[in-house]
Regions:
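Extracellular and secretory-pathway beta-repeat/beta-biased strand scaffolds
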Residues: 1-444
Length: 444
């Protein structure tokens, strides 16, 4: 560490490091190895690793701040906290950090009113495992930026995948990045920008999250067990938030048994053109893909309604319109391997009411379920023809084009409509398993 330690803290084994006057940087160009289960911590306002760091079954930490506290039990890390931010806070890894079966933490804490913090990984972060569950990797830059163009891996050869959490105000996952939490006996968990439907308040919510084309994110089970969980999120209640996902996202079930996992891509504004999503299972139940912006229109183009300027990691997203769009072909492709839920929120700081509009024909031979769950209205302006079941939930369901569901005779799953039904067209369920629950007057 380039931070100071008070004599009293040293004598009482209090690992508190604090800037006292000037503090230099910490740069590693060599090899640093800890005994099994031990801890390695590089602490300074600016920290850079251009060498190799290894702490098998232990902890490797790169921490940026003006005051940092570690809690150790012997050589084992129990807790850490960056208690005071710093100007030009920077943590970067350019080569390799390995903590097999252990924990890797890259954390930068800036002074928000002066400068943002930055965490950059262009190398390899590996907390994988052979026999056990994969380890844990955390990248954190609250009120700052995270840029990843390397490999982050908590996979397990025989166990289940581990945990990866990437949290910052702005997150950019560059082409050719790999973020992996696969496991032979079950998939792990990958959280980028938030938790599932913001269910964990301890996971910091991003304002802007970008996953570029050519990125691989995988929380699949390999042989046995269920697929894991992948969340790519920005705060859906913040009108400025934007989530862009163009990469390949997987949470597949095991090839021998197990169900598919679940994938969420959400943001107040959302663009997912040409995304590839797979939560399938060869022998179990297919998993789920949840899409949750404010208003959304299903179109034949899925054009982005925003501009991106600047250079990584300092990107600027500027929305040109409120509504999000999704290309109907991306839905059709994903239905082949996943149940899909498109949900709108329509509450909080956003300017819209949470409508879903279908403006392009949607035809699929898959027997997986499509769910449209609107905070307010669902408007069907183009025909939907599905082999599988469909669920429509909203205050009003307006049918200006026909819906055909269950055209595959082998499918007997229930389709349902919840909401006041109106419009000039109708709903056909080939196998006659249709439930309509309406409040108020309905015309159909």
């Amino acid at each position: 560490s380039s931070l100071a330690m008070k004599d009293g803290d040293f004598l009482t084994n209090n690992d508190i490091f604090e800037k006292d006057g000037l503090a230099g940087t910490v740069n590693n160009f060599g090899d640093i190895n800890a005994f099994k289960g031990g801890a390695i911590a590089l602490i300074a306002p600016q920290v850079s690793n251009q060498g190799n760091i290894s702490s098998s079954e232990g902890s490797s930490l790169l921490l940026s701040g003006d005051k940092v506290k570690l809690t150790l039990n012997g050589n084992k890390l129990i807790h850490y906290s960056v208690e005071k931010g710093t100007i030009d806070s920077l943590v970067e890894n350019d080569l390799a950090i390995n903590a097999g079966d252990g924990v890797i933490i890259l954390s930068a804490n800036g002074l928000a009113e002066v400068s943002q913090s930055v965490v950059k990984n262009s190398g390899t972060l590996q907390a994988d495992s052979i026999l056990k569950k994969g380890g844990k990797i955390y990248l954190s830059a609250r009120d700052g930026n995270i840029l990843n163009e390397g490999i982050i891996d908590t996979s397990s050869v025989q166990g289940s995948g581990g945990e990866i959490e990437i949290t910052a105000d702005e997150i950019s996952i560059k082409p050719d990045s790999q973020i992996l939490a696969t496991g032979d006996s079950g998939g792990g968990q990958i959280l980028i920008g938030g938790s599932w439907q913001n269910s964990d308040p301890d996971v910091y919510q991003a304002t802007r999250t970008l996953v570029e084309e050519g990125v691989k994110i995988d929380a699949s089970a390999i042989s046995n067990g269920d697929g894991g969980e992948v969340v790519i999120w920005s705060d859906i209640h913040d009108r400025k938030s934007l989530t862009q996902v163009y990469g390949k996202i997987s949470a597949k079930g095991g090839r021998n048994f197990g169900n598919g996992g679940r994938i969420e891509t959400s943001g107040s504004r959302l663009n997912i053109k040409n995304i590839f999503v797979d939560s399938s299972s060869p022998f179990g139940t297919h998993g789920e893909w949840l899409i949750d912006p404010y208003n959304i229109t299903i179109t034949s183009s899925g054009n982005a309604k925003h501009a991106v300027t600047g250079s990584s990691p300092n990107l600027t997203w500027t929305a040109n319109a409120d509504s999000s769009e999704i290309d109907v072909n991306d839905i059709i492709t994903a239905l082949s391997s996943s149940n899909i839920t498109i949900s709108t929120d329509g509450v909080g700081n956003g300017s819209q009411d949470g409508d879903i509009i279908v403006s392009a024909p949607l035809t699929s031979s898959s027997t997986n379920r499509l769910t449209l769950d609107a905070h307010r209205h669902i408007t069907i302006n183009s025909q939907i023809n599905l082999a599988g079941p469909i669920s429509l939930e909203g205050d009003d369901v307006i049918l200006n084009a026909n819906i055909i569901s269950g055209s595959n005779p082998s499918n007997t799953d229930l389709s349902y409509i919840i909401g006041k039904l109106s419009g000039s067209s109708g709903f056909s369920q080939d196998t006659a398993f249709l439930s309509v629950q309406a409040s108020g007057d309905s015309t159909y």
